[in-house]
């Protein structure tokens, strides 16, 4: 979790309004990873929503204000990289890709698609 903590420090210092609640959406289809991330960020004081799909993320974003998205690349309903590009075309919300893909090319493509950062699993 150290990599995510470093990213969160950057967002808190540069982009988050400290007077507003910080809403993080975790888009992850693996239940253990969902639970681990949700527990960690809830304990840190963030409001957390969890979904396993791109469709679920869109629904959350239509109904709630979102400050940051933690997005898995391999989702059951769509490619997380393409979802990143679509989100970036419509929004300035922070996007951190959280994935098991550790290849340098995947990282480059993720950032080119509009992600703000790229963190590999397993998370420590």
Over which residues does each language-model region extend?
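N-terminal/domain-start alpha-helical segments
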Residues: 11-124
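Intrinsic-disorder-associated, low-complexity terminal segments enriched in Asp/Asn/His/Tyr and depleted
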Residues: 7-9
């Amino acid at each position: 979790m150290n990599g995510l903590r470093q990213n969160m420090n950057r967002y808190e210092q540069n982009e988050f309004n400290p007077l507003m609640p910080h809403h993080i959406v975790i888009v992850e289809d693996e239940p253990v990873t969902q639970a681990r991330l949700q527990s960690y960020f809830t304990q840190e004081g963030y409001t957390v929503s969890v979904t396993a799909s791109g469709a679920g993320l869109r629904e959350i974003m239509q109904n709630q204000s979102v400050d940051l998205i933690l997005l898995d690349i391999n989702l059951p309903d769509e490619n997380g990289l393409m979802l990143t590009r679509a989100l970036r075309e419509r929004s300035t919300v922070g996007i951190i890709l959280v994935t098991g893909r550790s290849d340098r090319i995947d990282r480059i493509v993720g950032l080119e698609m509009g992600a703000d950062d790229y963190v590999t699993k397993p998370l420590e």
